[in-house]
């Protein structure tokens, strides 16, 4: 099993958390129970990936900008999960010396969710052993739109010359200036990015599994890491990475 000290170990792993509703449907349970099971699994995988396996950055796609179009009761339950559990996750990550960040638009989120998010970030802001990046009310198109608007405002204000705009400038205006994604994992059998970290995934390796997220165990995560270690990453060139 690859470890964090080996060259073929991913620095940044991103997971599209998918399959909670199908998990509940298969068991003839309410959708809310699927989300609860998925959130419990998310806490376990977060502790394991960053705290035990040594992944430096873990990005989790937990709620997209498009998810607000779902049934209001389901959205409300998800907001309850976030508001009621983020503080516990903050304590767990703080004990492990890991920082918690959020990527996404704050507009539209309930104040109690924002308060829990701010608590997590404030409590863990000085930690350096790893980063957990919760992507909440996130969409890559929205992120790039917001980045372009911010850059345009700087050009208009005269603080940035158009000729100075390059990839690094764009990256600094994304929600978070993090390393590029090395490994993108999607559960539930779907094989698409669904508007997640499009810029950051330029050279990512993709790992798709039929496993629904509530069933995505530590062993499943290790299997994804092992598959990544077998990949021949050339990053557009001839040199293996």
Map each language-model feature to its residues:
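Flexible, compositionally biased loop and terminal segments
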Residues: 1-241
